Amino acid sequence: MSHYDDILHGMEEWSNLKAGKWETWDLPNIPIIRSRLPKPAIDFVWKKIEEAQEEEDYQSMKKNLVGNITESLELQDTDDYFFRHILKDTAEHYVESFPTNCSKNPFSDNKIKELYMKSFWVNFSQKHEFNPVHDHNGVLSFVIWLKIPTKWQEQHQLPISLDSNLPCASNFQFFYSDIFGSTRGMVVEMDPMMEGCILMFPSILQHQVYPFYDSDGYRISISGNLCFDPKAFKDML
């Protein structure tokens, strides 16, 4: 839909207003998207994790990341399987739907939407470890939860959280600005039922991960960044 079509659609909405009847009018914004991975995709990423752990010259990603956690290992998306089968179509449709909102891309007016996965890694975290507030490089980023050793209800009943008016133990949290310019947080509570779920979001959207407690298990998650394909820029020259 062109900008002109947007204006016409907006005028039509005004013309349809009924006298004396109030209705909500949501300000434009963009969503984040979520899904549950099919079993073949889950099996694929577990296999890639095993391969990364077995590598004698495994590539630690810790020096490139803000996480205060046990380990982050680079993963290999063999034959671009995960990107092509799980991410590509959805991500490119997202960028096409929200072209000027997804990134700081200076060429967004040229409708470039071809993407590739620039980075792909697995995170292993133990109790008391955390990821501070940060964003990512790229256009879109994603997180997949593979193993969650705690339940948020139990974590929020721990002494450090029980009497708080904002219990956060084990939470994942996004930060964004509301219509007043105030910073708001959107919490994603961690529970084993979320194992296998994926969230995709603009890379510049800030987020953090709080520590969990009273469990000796690992929290295992996968992250990755999607960028515009450099070949698309080359074709423009």
Predicted regions and their residues:
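Non-heme Fe(II)/2-oxoglutarate
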Residues: 2-113, 119-131, 168
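A short hydrophobic beta-strand segment most commonly corresponding to one strand
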Residues: 141-144, 216-232
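Residue-level marker of positions within ordered structural domains that often coincide
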Residues: 50, 147, 201, 214, ...
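Short, charged beta-turn/beta-strand-edge "cap" motif at the junction between a beta-strand
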Residues: 205-208
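Catalytic core of non-heme Fe(II) oxygenases with the double-stranded beta-helix
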Residues: 118-200, 210, 217-218
